[in-house]
C-alpha cells in the first residue's frame, strides 16, 4: 500500500483494479490494511473508478473475500470474484489447476487470460447496463480504524548517516 502513491497514483489513473484477496488473510487486520489502500486510491486526486478483484487459492478456494467484500459493500464498489467464477470450474474438473497456476496462488499466462476474461465480461456488462454519467463519489467514514490510508514509504537509501560508529574498548 505504501508504494501506491509513487507506483500508481503519480501516473494519475482514471481506472484502478485492486487485487489483494489471496495474499491477505481473512482477518480484521487485513481488512483494515485493505481499506487503507482502497481509500488511498478512491480518494486520490483523479478519483479513479475502482474495481476490486478477489482471486483465490486454486487448491482450496481460500481468500480474503469475506473481509474485503465488507469494504466493497461499505464503499459501494464493484467486485469480481474468482471464487465464484473460475474456482467452481476447477472443483468440477473442467479446468485443471495446473493449467492456470504453477503454485495454486499466482496465475500463469493462461490463468491471467482467464482472470482477464472474467474482468472483461464484467466491464462489458457494466458498460452495456450503465452508460449514464456518474456523480461525484461519496466517501463514507471508514469502516475500520483506518490507520493505513496515509501510510508512506521511506527508503533507507535517502537516509543520511549523522553519527560516527562507536568503538568498544576491551578492558582486561
Predicted regions located by residue number:
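Alpha-helical cap/lid subdomain in secreted, periplasmic
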Residues: 2-132
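Hydrophobic transmembrane signal anchors and adjacent membrane-proximal interface regions, especially
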Residues: 69, 84, 150, 160-161
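Single conserved hydrophobic/aromatic residue that forms the stacking wall/gate
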Residues: 160-171
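Charge-rich interaction segments
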Residues: 125-159
Amino acid at each position: 500500500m505504501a508504494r501506491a502513491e509513487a507506483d500508481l497514483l503519480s501516473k494519475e489513473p482514471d481506472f484502478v483494479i485492486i487485487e489483494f484477496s489471496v495474499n491477505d488473510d481473512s482477518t480484521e487486520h487485513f481488512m483494515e490494511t485493505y481499506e487503507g489502500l482502497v481509500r488511498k486510491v478512491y480518494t486520490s486526486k483523479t478519483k479513479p473508478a475502482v474495481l476490486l478483484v478477489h482471486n483465490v487459492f486454486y487448491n482450496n478456494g481460500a481468500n480474503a473475500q469475506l473481509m474485503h467484500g465488507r469494504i466493497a459493500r461499505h464503499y459501494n464498489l464493484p467486485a469480481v470474484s474468482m471464487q465464484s467464477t473460475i474456482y467452481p470450474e476447477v472443483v468440477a474438473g473442467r479446468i485443471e489447476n495446473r493449467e492456470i497456476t504453477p503454485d495454486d496462488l499466482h496465475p500463469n499466462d493462461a490463468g491471467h487470460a482467464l482472470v482477464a476474461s472474467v474482468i472483461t465480461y464484467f466491464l462489458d456488462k457494466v458498460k452495456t447496463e450503465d452508460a449514464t454519467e456518474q456523480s461525484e463519489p461519496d466517501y463514507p467514514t471508514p469502516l475500520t480504524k483506518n490507520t493505513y490510508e496515509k501510510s508512506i514509504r521511506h527508503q533507507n537509501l535517502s537516509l543520511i548517516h549523522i553519527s560516527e560508529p562507536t568503538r568498544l574498548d576491551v578492558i582486561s
